[in-house]
Each structure stands twice: as structure tokens, then as C-alpha cells.
Amino acid sequence: MNRKHDGASISFQPRIRRGAFFEACWDHGCRNFSVYNRTYISSTFSNPVDEYWHVINHVSLWPVMGERQIEISGDDAERFVQYITCRDISNCSVNQCKYALLLNNEGGIICDPILLRLEENKFWISTSDCDLELWIKGVQINSGFNVQIKDANVSLLQ
């Protein structure tokens, strides 16, 4: 069933984060937002047809505020990151990114993030709309790996 919800609005709640570019998007006319990874993200600034032609004929800058960076650091960071992904990261140099798969015990895909090696023992995992930080902390809790896991609290642009 297709229903129109003309006039629908969204209430901004404190439990949903406003990314670093939220106010700038608002100031530039965005009045349509959606929630992605517990973050308000800008949806449209005018109308979809005008925005399509703008992307085709001009330049667009997209705040991907909902893509969170999970930081894994510590003496065992490389071994732990290798433990949670099936991608061989032994040849991942500092300042290099790799596409990685994180799988559950049955081989199902949990998430397919981009992995960035910032330092020898510091990685960022760029997560999409999933609770990956909680899953990673759950894997680490009794693993014996000496790592720290946290939200890097940065905002990205594409």
C-alpha cells in the first residue's frame, strides 16, 4: 500500500545526534532530514529533480554525518582488527584504506566498512547504519586483546 504523508514533520530529539554540519545544512536551506545511524542527516535542500540536475551539471558536497568512525587502538590493535575481519590487513600501510567485511559466526555479513590505518596501532572503521561499535566491544570484552575502542567523534564530507 502506498500512502502519502504530506505535511509530515520530524521532531528533533536529544537522543538523536546532530552532526557537525547540521546547522550549516539548516542555514543553507535544508528542511528535510532523516535519521541514519542515530544521526540526523540532510535529505533535500530544494526538490529531488532540481537536486538531480545540480549534481549532473555542478558540484555537490554531501555531509555524511551518519557514518561514524570507530577507533581501535592499543598494542594489539592490528591483531584485533585482523581477528574481526576476514580481509588480510597485513599489507595495510599507515594512511591507507581497505574495504573490509565483518562477519558473524555463521558467515553472514554484519557490516562492510572502510578500514583506515591511522598509525601502526590505531585504526578507524567507518561504519554505516548499524551498531558496530557495540558488536566490536562485545567481541573484545573477553578476547584478551589489549585494545581501546571508542567513537572517534569526527564528521565526514564526500
Region locations from a protein language model:
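Acidic, low-complexity central loop/insert segments
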Residues: 111-158
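Acidic, proline/glycine-enriched N-terminal capping motif
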Residues: 1-103, 108
